[in-house]
């Protein structure tokens, strides 16, 4: 039996200042160690002040997952010895004696209706970034630290070990990412904005933690590898040790970093510099009223409003920018089935193949409407539409501009097509005889015609004309 639990660390990218000081959160691209202050650096005597907007963001997430919200925020010191936190403790939260998490309980449902329970949500600060200039963590000759990230406001979302398959872990993270995007508190497309620690055990064995995994896809890969590694150890009669491992995405393996600490090793106790922050009922209700439309509600609305399938609605909503593109385009293009088909089966598939996200695309509503209109009036074929998608996505060129520059307008002249078909039939006599016995072979002949016409012929029309020529 496989048990998987996740600890997800979410950057609150919507916040303008760090969690306990007034340093700006826009550190990406800045020179190392330039966005810091005595609080970020953990200097003696520096007094932290809690950013109230982080509390509001945590309450939004708690409401979105139906969690129980605490009546106060108690920050604790989590002690550990590691260079990414200069003061040798992280200001965080913990659900234990003398402390309380901002929320506990709650759940997220997967597509098969399986419920993944949430244990708690913590508010905490991000540590500094560790840089390995001459290689990886294991091979670099020395290590550098960039404290620009130190103190960045985070939410730690801890699940119960309710997942039993790496695919479920990936789906959970994709669903959580969609919730965060719709709430507008975090931009998951930014590097490092959402990272996960995965805890996994097999057949009642010791728990292994895989730290700091960068994406839902990598979480799935890391867990698949770790399950195979642990099963191999058990098969050899060896013991699975309680330990912390690192996911090497380049080599696609987990690597031992240290023995796993027990919770008591962190020596949690309330931070004396941060008094408890009161969370009132009125504050919670005000935030509840201001919540935007959440993914599950949006999925139901898309199905009802546009008549698309629940599966297609799920695919759209899992990435907010894709769902937004669909709805914006649907205002002026009413063939919703055709629109969702080209978005999911062509546009999204191409992006996934190139490891790109919809937010990285230059395609707009204007591009999509023009592309679909050109298809509808027969100016281009679906094959041409697929062929020009990369130029639309990467360069932002209009479809009409691309087909004009490359002479890609569809061939509608049937007399011309019949001449091309006759030429193909004379060249492919064996295929012609086979086609008369097996109509599926006609697809081969259609392909030959498409090649001769540079994909500018409509394959459906070509198919019908070939049948007519062959008397089928």
UniProtKB/Swiss-Prot annotation:
Q: Name one GO biological process term.
A: glutaminyl-tRNAGln biosynthesis via transamidation
Record-linked Pfam families? GatB_N (PF02934), GatB_Yqey (PF02637)
GO molecular function terms listed in the Swiss-Prot or TrEMBL record: asparaginyl-tRNA synthase (glutamine-hydrolyzing) activity; ATP binding; glutaminyl-tRNA synthase (glutamine-hydrolyzing) activity
- Superkingdom classification of source: Archaea
EC main class here is ligase
Q: Which residues cross the membrane?
A: none
Reactions catalysed according to its record: L-glutamyl-tRNA(Gln) + L-glutamine + ATP + H2O = L-glutaminyl-tRNA(Gln) + L-glutamate + ADP + phosphate + H(+); L-aspartyl-tRNA(Asn) + L-glutamine + ATP + H2O = L-asparaginyl-tRNA(Asn) + L-glutamate + ADP + phosphate + 2 H(+)
NCBIfam families from the UniProt entry: gatB, PRK05477.1-2, PRK05477.1-4
General function of this protein:
Allows the formation of correctly charged Asn-tRNA(Asn) or Gln-tRNA(Gln) through the transamidation of misacylated Asp-tRNA(Asn) or Glu-tRNA(Gln) in organisms which lack either or both of asparaginyl-tRNA or glutaminyl-tRNA synthetases. The reaction takes place in the presence of glutamine and ATP through an activated phospho-Asp-tRNA(Asn) or phospho-Glu-tRNA(Gln).
Could you give the subunit structure recorded for this chain?
Heterotrimer of A, B and C subunits.
Q: Could you identify this protein by its name?
A: Aspartyl/glutamyl-tRNA(Asn/Gln) amidotransferase subunit B
**Upper lineage ranks?**
Archaea, Thermoproteota, Thermoprotei, Sulfolobales, Sulfolobaceae
């Amino acid at each position: 039996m496989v048990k998987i639990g996740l600890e997800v660390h979410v950057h609150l990218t919507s916040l303008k200042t760090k969690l306990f000081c007034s340093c700006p959160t826009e550190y990406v691209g800045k020179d190392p160690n330039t966005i810091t202050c005595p609080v970020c650096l953990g200097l003696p005597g520096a007094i932290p002040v809690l950013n109230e907007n982080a509390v509001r963001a945590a309450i939004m997430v708690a409401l979105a997952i139906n969690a129980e919200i605490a009546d106060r925020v108690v920050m604790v010191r989590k002690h550990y010895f590691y260079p990414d936190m200069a003061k040798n403790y992280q200001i965080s939260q913990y659900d234990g004696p003398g402390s309380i998490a901002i929320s506990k309980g709650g759940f997220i449902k997967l597509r098969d209706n399986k419920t993944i329970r949430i244990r708690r949500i913590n508010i905490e600060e991000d540590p500094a970034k560790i840089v390995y200039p001459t290689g990886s963590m294991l091979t670099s000759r020395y290590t550098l630290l960039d404290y620009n990230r130190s103190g960045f406001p985070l939410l730690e979302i801890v699940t119960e070990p309710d997942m039993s398959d790496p695919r479920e872990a990936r789906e959970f993270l994709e669903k959580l990412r969609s919730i965060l995007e719709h709430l507008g508190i975090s931009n998951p497309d930014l590097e490092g904005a959402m990272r996960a620690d995965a805890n996994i055990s097999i057949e009642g064995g010791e728990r292994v933690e895989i730290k700091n995994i960068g994406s839902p896809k990598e979480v799935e890969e890391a867990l698949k590898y770790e399950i195979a590694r642990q099963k191999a150890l058990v098969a050899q009669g060896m013991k699975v040790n309680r330990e912390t491992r690192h996911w090497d995405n380049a080599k696609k393996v987990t690597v031992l970093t240290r023995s796993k600490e027990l919770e008591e090793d962190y020596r949690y106790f309330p931070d004396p510099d941060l008094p408890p922050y009161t969370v009132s009922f009125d504050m919670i209700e005000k935030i509840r009223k201001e919540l935007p439309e959440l993914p599950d509600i949006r999925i139901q609305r898309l199905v009802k409003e546009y008549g698309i399938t629940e599966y297609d609605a799920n695919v759209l909503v899992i990435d907010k920018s894709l769902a937004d593109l669909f709805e914006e385009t649907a205002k002026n293009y009413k063939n919703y089935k055709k629109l969702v088909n080209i978005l999911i089966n062509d546009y999204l598939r191409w992006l996934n193949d190139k490891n790109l996200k919809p937010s990285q695309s230059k395609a707009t509503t204007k591009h999509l409407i023009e592309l679909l209109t050109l298809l509808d009036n027969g100016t281009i074929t679906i094959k041409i539409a697929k062929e020009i998608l990369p130029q639309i996505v990467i360069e932002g060129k209009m479809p009409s501009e691309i087909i004009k520059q490359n002479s890609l307008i569809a061939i509608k002249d049937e007399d011309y097509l019949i001449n091309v078909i006759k030429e193909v039939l004379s060249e492919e006599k064996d295929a012609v005889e086979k086609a008369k016995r097996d109509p599926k072979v006609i697809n081969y002949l259609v392909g030959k015609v498409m090649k001769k016409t540079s994909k500018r012929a409509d394959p459906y029309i070509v198919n019908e004309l070939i049948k007519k020529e062959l008397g089928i």
